[in-house]
């Protein structure tokens, strides 16, 4: 999980979602998981 000020898609499989007001990126590749912090 990377915590970044700005999250973006790193590959075509990445999806940007909002959970409880937190922006996250979920992906098949676990190295692409991100959260806005």
Swiss-Prot record:
Keywords for the protein's UniProt record, in alphabetical order: Ribonucleoprotein, Ribosomal protein
Superkingdom per UniProt: Bacteria
GO cellular component: cytoplasm; ribonucleoprotein complex; ribosome
Entry's Gene Ontology molecular function annotations: structural constituent of ribosome
Pfam family, one: Ribosomal_L36
GO biological process: translation
InterPro entries reported for this sequence: Ribosomal_bL36, Ribosomal_bL36_sp
Protein family (similarity comment): Belongs to the bacterial ribosomal protein bL36 family.
NCBIfam families the UniProt entry points to: rpmJ_bact (TIGR01022)
Protein name: Large ribosomal subunit protein bL36
């Amino acid at each position: 999980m990377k915590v970044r000020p700005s999250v973006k898609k790193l590959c075509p499989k990445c999806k940007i979602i909002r959970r409880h007001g937190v922006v996250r990126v979920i992906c098949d590749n676990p190295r692409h998981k991100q959260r806005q912090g």
